[in-house]
Amino acid sequence: MGIKYLLRDKMVVRSWRHIKERYCLIGVRCKNCGTVYFPSREICPKCRRKTEFEEIKLSGKGKVYTYSVVHVAPKDFEKQAPYVIAIIELEEGARITGQIVDCKPEDVYIGMQVEAVFRRIKEDGDDGVITYGYKFKPIEN
């Protein structure tokens, strides 16, 4: 049983369980077919079965696969609008959703080379906890 069992049974706060994905871009590679996924999972959709995975540190570099400009933002993000949310295809093959920063929405395009950066996501209330995580910025050529 022990601590590992408690962690698997989600007895700890959710934010602690997702530290590797949120702050380090740690993904997994299926040992059977080699497909890379982010965030981690227990079943490989390609193999269609439960299999073994190995953790891998993702480079954070990739290209914009598709994107959308958000003009009417949800609560806590109103001040950022308009902003771009994109699906990024990482060099390792995994696709990840993230905000594009450090450029105007009209400058974003499909195929644009980007890299992950660690940024402020939001703040809970006036005196609340600041949440940080990854976003993506264009790679200057």
UniProtKB/Swiss-Prot annotation:
In terms of InterPro entries, this protein maps to:
ChsH2_C, ChsH2_Znr, NA-bd_OB-fold, Thioester_dehydratase-like
Keyword entries, A-Z: Metal-binding, Zinc
- Name the SUPFAM superfamilies for this protein: Nucleic acid-binding proteins
Per UniProt, what is one GO molecular function of this protein? metal ion binding
Asked if Transmembrane helix is a keyword of the record, the answer is no
Please list the residues that bind Zn(2+): C30, C33, C44, C47
According to its UniProt entry, the function of this protein is described as: Functions as a scaffold to connect the acetoacetyl-CoA thiolase and HMG-CoA synthase (HMGCS) dimers in the channeling thiolase/HMGCS complex, which allows for efficient coupling of the endergonic thiolase reaction with the exergonic HMGCS reaction.
Question: Can you tell me which family this protein belongs to?
Answer: Belongs to the scaffold protein DUF35 family.
**Tell me, how does this one assemble?**
Interacts with acetoacetyl-CoA thiolase and HMG-CoA synthase (HMGCS) that catalyzes the first and second step in the mevalonate pathway, respectively.
Name the chain's protein. DUF35 domain-containing scaffold protein
